[in-house]
Amino acid sequence: MTKTKIIFMGTPQFAATVLKGLIDSNQYEILAVVTQPDRKVGRKQELRMTPVKELALTVNLPVLQPEKLSGSVEMTQIMTLLESGEVGIVTAAFGQFLPGKLLDVAQFAVNTHASLLPKYRGGAPIHYAIMNGEKEAGVTIMEMIRKMDAGDMIAQDSTPILEDDNVGTMFEKLALVGRDLLLETLPKYLSGQLKAQAQNEDEVTFSPNISPEEEKIDWNKSAREIFNKVRGMNPFPVAHTTWNGERFKIYETKVVDDSVGNLQAGEIVEKTKKSLKVATGEGLLELLFVQPAGKPKMDIVSFLNGLGQKIQVGDKFGD
C-alpha cells in the first residue's frame, strides 16, 4: 500500500495525540513535523519542548520550529517538500497562521479544530465553550483556506462537557475524538468518498486567544458564570483575583445555592476550618483549590491552615 505523504503541524498535547494516531496507523509517510519553538515555562523558566516535538524525536521524525513561518528558512524547507509532489498538510492546534502559498502548493490541507464549527473559530475554542456554559464540545475536520477556520467541513464529532470538566480534561477527551475522527475520515476524503460541506456563516462565533484582562474574575458576575470561567481557564491560563494587593489564582470552585442577601460582590461571607465562601453578583461561590502569590497550588484546607488564617469574614477579594 502506498502511504500518503504529509507534513504535520501542531504544538500542544492535543496535537501530539493526533500525530501519534497518524504514526500508529501506518498509512502516512510523515516527511516533517512543524511545531512552535521551545519556550521557557514555569516559575523556574526552564526551556521546554512542545509535546509534538517530544513525540517526533522519539520516532526520529525531522522537526522544524519556525518562530514565524512567513519568510523563514523553515518555510523554504517546507515548500521544497511540498513541491516534491503529492504531499499534503495536516494540522492540529499549530498556533500559527499558514501562509497562502503553502496552501496553494499542498496537494491537500486539513485542520483538526477543537470546536463544532462554525462556532468558536480561533485559538481558544475549548476555553470559550466551557466559559460560556456549553453542554457539549467537539472536533471538526476541515479544509484549510486563507481565512481562519473558515474552510469547508469534512466531518464532525461531539462529546458532553460535564460539570466537573475543565480545559485540561476536555483537551484530553477532544484529542481522542479528533484523532479517531481524522483517522476515520481522512482516507475517505482523499479518495473522494466524503465531500466537504460549507459552514453556515450566519452561525459563526469566535474564540480568540485569552487576553490577560479576561483572566481576571469579575465578582459582580453570577456564581455560575464565575464557576464556568474558573474551570474554563484551569489548568491554563488560570483565572485570578487579588488578595492583600497580590494576585490570587483560583483553580476550582463550587456554586452554592444560598440566597446572598445584601452583600458586596467579592466579600467573604463564611469561613470555617474547611471552607471559604464568597459573595458574587448572584449566589455564593465556595473556593476549593487556590494559589496565593509566590506559593504552589493548594486545596482550600491547606490555605486556611496557613496564609488563609489571616482572612476574615467581611474581607473582600478583588480591587
UniProtKB/Swiss-Prot annotation:
EC number of this enzyme: 2.1.2.9
Gene3D superfamilies in the record: Formyl transferase, C-terminal domain (3.10.25.10), Formyl transferase, N-terminal domain (3.40.50.170)
Keyword Magnesium: no
Superkingdom per UniProt: Bacteria
Pfam families referenced in this protein's UniProt entry, alphabetically: Formyl_trans_C, Formyl_trans_N
Residues bound to (6S)-5,6,7,8-tetrahydrofolate: 115-118
Catalytic reactions of this protein: L-methionyl-tRNA(fMet) + (6R)-10-formyltetrahydrofolate = N-formyl-L-methionyl-tRNA(fMet) + (6S)-5,6,7,8-tetrahydrofolate + H(+)
Keywords in alphabetical order: Protein biosynthesis, Transferase
GO molecular function, one term: methionyl-tRNA formyltransferase activity
GO cellular component: cytosol
InterPro entries linked to this entry: Fmt, Formyl_trans_C, Formyl_trans_C_sf, Formyl_transf_N, Formyl_transf_N_sf, Formyl_transferase-like_C_sf, Met-tRNA-FMT_C, Met-tRNA-FMT_N
Family: Belongs to the Fmt family.
Function: Attaches a formyl group to the free amino group of methionyl-tRNA(fMet). The formyl group appears to play a dual role in the initiator identity of N-formylmethionyl-tRNA by promoting its recognition by IF2 and preventing the misappropriation of this tRNA by the elongation apparatus.
NCBIfam families cross-referenced by the UniProt entry: fmt
Protein name per UniProt: Methionyl-tRNA formyltransferase
Organism from which the protein derives: Lactococcus lactis subsp. lactis (strain IL1403)
Lineage: Bacteria, Bacillati, Bacillota, Bacilli, Lactobacillales
Gene: fmt
